[in-house]
A protein has these predicted regions:
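Conserved ATP-binding/catalytic motifs of P-loop helicase motor domains
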Residues: 1-272
């Protein structure tokens, strides 16, 4: 960075160069899966990158915040710096999830009896935690089903699917990758797709967007999203924005499994 600046006769403490270093640091950070950085850490990292004192970068950062090129949010008194689109995505997700959880619960008449019938049909009894998850999936608008390998997530999902289908609910099964979607389809015996295929990617105008969005909602009653740990903040924002007001979402995953490639640890943050 220094040699390029010298070649083009750019002063080391030029305002544009300082601001570019801050943006580069946050974008690099996003590429490593993080949506923000504490202010102090951002200044130190950018300082090491362009060999300028943190004090000069602090002035550039304040200007970026003033012009809203960057955004700041306090957590426990510590200022965290965001790229605007990532903060907007986080806040949008939080607002939509809050709206889902505050919505009235769904009625499920004869649920315990239907679970018993399912157990007789399957030839085995569900564990108490599995039954609790099944009940919540049938009554709650937003549910996280989590656990490590071998904890019965697939068995629980299949029970939920059977009960939803018995009620003629329209269910969309999806996962963040093609491999995960194929595995979900094999384990459930039902069609599953990637989130991108479910939302239908639109390349019109050279900008990647989705045909299904907050103005063209998905026509389903329940979305079951597998491998939630791999879903980044922007993709989850796109999915949850495309849900109808009455649509429910069931998120399945293991927070200790593969993280998302893009920024954001959605599953881990929801669990916490």
């Amino acid at each position: 960075a220094d040699s390029i600046a010298q070649y083009y006769h750019v002063e080391g403490d030029c305002a544009q160069r300082l601001e570019a270093a801050l943006l580069r640091t946050l974008r690099h950070n996003a590429g490593n899966g993080h949506t923000c950085l504490p202010r102090t850490q951002l200044l130190e990292t950018a300082s090491n990158f362009i060999h300028q004192p943190p004090e000069k970068l602090a002035a550039a950062l304040d200007e970026c915040i003033r012009t809203e090129e960057l955004r700041v949010k306090l957590f426990d008194g510590t200022p965290y710096i965001y790229l605007p689109d990532l903060l907007e995505a986080e806040e949008d997700i939080a607002a939509r999830l809050a709206m889902l959880t505050k919505r009235g619960k769904n009625t499920a008449h004869g649920l315990d009896k239907n679970i018993q019938i399912l157990e007789l049909t399957q030839g085995f009894a569900y564990a108490p935690l599995q039954k609790e998850a099944i009940r919540k999936a049938m009554t709650e608008n937003c549910l996280v089903l989590t656990g490590g390998p071998g904890t019965g997530k697939t068995t629980t999902v299949n029970a939920i699917l059977q009960l939803l289908e018995d009620q003629a609910e329209r269910v969309a099964l999806c996962a963040p990758t093609g491999r995960a979607a194929k595995r979900l389809s094999e384990l459930t015996g039902r069609k599953a797709s990637t989130i991108h295929r479910l939302l239908e990617v639109d390349y019109t105008g050279g900008v990647v967007s989705f045909i299904h969005n907050d103005k063209n909602l998905l026509k389903c009653d329940v979305v079951i999203l597998d491998e939630m740990s791999m879903v980044d903040v922007k993709l989850f924002q796109a999915l949850i924005a495309a849900l109808r007001y009455s649509c429910r979402i069931i998120m399945v995953g293991d927070a200790d499994q593969l993280p998302s490639v893009g920024p954001g640890n959605i599953l881990g943050e929801i669990i916490r």
